[in-house]
Each structure stands twice: as C-alpha cells, then as structure tokens.
C-alpha cells in the first residue's frame, strides 16, 4: 500500500542521495550532477529475498569442484573474461548504439545452446519477431534458448525462478523498472534498484546474468556510477560503428585481468573473431611513406603490432596545432618537448598530427619510442624501413627505459616477418637474443634516431 511520495535528489555520477538540491556532490565532488526524482514510500510486506538464510563457513570448507567456468564459444570473449564465464557473476556490457552489444550476446546465446545449456534472453527494446529476424541472420539456434519481452522486474524474477536457466541476458538495464519505484525506467533510482535485484538473483541462484548498458555522450554507462561498482565485470565495446572492427575491453573484472582485449570483425552474419589482431591492424599499410612506423604494445599477455602515423608540417598559425588520435594527447606533447630539447628538432613552429592506424586506442608507455621515431621520420621526410619494429618507454631526459615482456614482443615481430627490432638496451639479455632477427639496443632518443636514418 502506498503511504505517500517524497522528492529525492540523486547524483547522476555516483548515485549519492540528498533531500535537497546541491551544486556540488559530496560523494564524487562533481558539479551540477543532481537530478530530482519522486520516490514512493511502499510497504514491502509481500517482498521476499531471493537468498536463503545461511550460516558462516570457513574458507577451507568451501568446495570449488562445481565452480568451473563455462566456455562462451568465443575465444576473444573468454580471454577478456579471464578464461570463461563465471557462474553466478553479473556482467555489464556497455557501448555506443549500433556497436554490436546485442549481436555479441546473441551469438554467445547461440554457442551456449549448442552446448545444451538453458539460456533466457530478455529484451525490453525489441519484439519477439524482431529478435527472431536478428537470430536468423546469425545462424541456427538450439532448442534451449528461451525469449521473453518484458520490462517488469517482478515478472522477470518469477520467470527466472520458474525456468532456472544457467545464463540470462538483460537487454537493456535502462528499460527495466520496479513497480514500487514511481520514477521512469532509465532513471537513477530505477537503474540502481534493478541492478541490485539482478545481483541478488545472480548470487542467490548461481545464475550468470549479462546486462546491456547504454553509454552517455561522455562514453560511460548511463545511470549512476555505483552501477559499475555493483557488478562483477564491466566490459566496453569500442570502435567506429562505420568500420568493420570492434574492440572488447575489460574495465573491471573480479575474476581476471583488466588488461586483456578481444578483437572482432563485423560481418553480415554477425561478429567474427580476429585471432591475429597484429596482422589485422597492419593490413593496408602504405609503402615508402615517411612518418609511419610499426610499434608493439602489450594488451595483457597478448602482443599487438600497430602502425603509428605522424604528419609534421610548418604552421601558419600563431599557436601550432597538435592533434592525437588513438593515444594520449598530453603524452604526445611531452614527447615532442623531449625531441626539441634532447634531439635538437625545432618543432615549436610546426603543426603535429599523430594517429594510431586502425582506430585502436593505445596508451602503454612502450609505444613512446614509436611516436618519437614517427615524428622524426615525418619531420625529416625520411622513410623508415617497413621491416623495422620499435618499442620502448622514453623519459624526460631522452633516455629509453626498460619495458616488460620484451621477449614476447620480439617473437611476435619475427612471426609476422619483421627483420629488425629497435628496443631499449637495458632489455638486452640471453632471453631476448633470438636468432633470425636483427636486434638494435638503444639507450636514448639520439641513438634511436641514428638507427633509423
């Protein structure tokens, strides 16, 4: 029975509650993030918890025999999740509209039904016929996939309790609502309470739940920031919706590393895995072009070869223009200052445009040397040998510092046919002395420049 209504102000960034509007949120210190919502006071006499009453147990008394991970049928997704799908986990998948979130999860459902696992796909945005049309494009599905078009969480909870599926997909969290809350679906309170209920279902019934979340124009999942704190895993689907590639990146993972990425290619029949992203990223690289160099970055345990492009030209403006796509803008400015001070290049009057080809975002310090040499190549209009690869971190004194996993990077370069590696001299040891490829160790940026020119 509804007793009455009251007005509460929520912070859209962190979910902080207040009885009055505030200019600055006391929780996250952000400005102008409070929104007004009307909340009903409801007697929850019939409400019951999903969890059963339990007693504390010792750590040694917990068995993990039945807690093996499920295979999603997609190696790239399993890599990002840390080795497979963990039972009872709550996974949030975010990304721009049209990037392929629903397609990815529908393909996961197909793979799980091929393993005879019971899967429930709940959509709040599409009709059953529309889901069938998308599924037909992907391929044949097993008989253990069940569809439900519903946004009422109480109905969804009863359906899950009745079916007892192994995996549930919620598409999307912004369309779900709880009747006890009077605010509209997608509001701060609805998203937070909906996620809380789904978390109870996942943990109480040991069911894996995938949640699709829309992102804002700033690139974060719409709703309170606390949403990301509540779930076990947060995955972001990145990439240009007009391009063929997609990058799945783990931002939070309680059951694995957050450094891994998965690479997919968008095709007519759905998403295809890219098992060798280095070859994929270097496809179409121009020959005999200055300002282009191949660098190696590590994403978790996987080495990825990328093309770094630089265009340096005289500026007609009072303040030269600097642009960086795919890497940190401030890092590029820092490296240009190092070149001007330590290598004697006059870049203060030049426009600079730096790009990571393929649209992938890389911020690992090991690509510093690649950015440095691409800038020098464009500035001096000298072509770097296409069979040369570089990696290394650059300090403010111009020194080339050590990086991790040098051996894996060299092996990846050799596998793809590169003949020369320019890397930090401090990384030279018995493990990195690999036959069949020329290794050039450098101590500073001056030595690196002499090695390529």
Whereabouts are the PLM-identified features?
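Peripheral, non-AAA+ core regions of ATP-driven protein-machinery
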Residues: 2-13, 17-79, 86-94, 99-106, ...
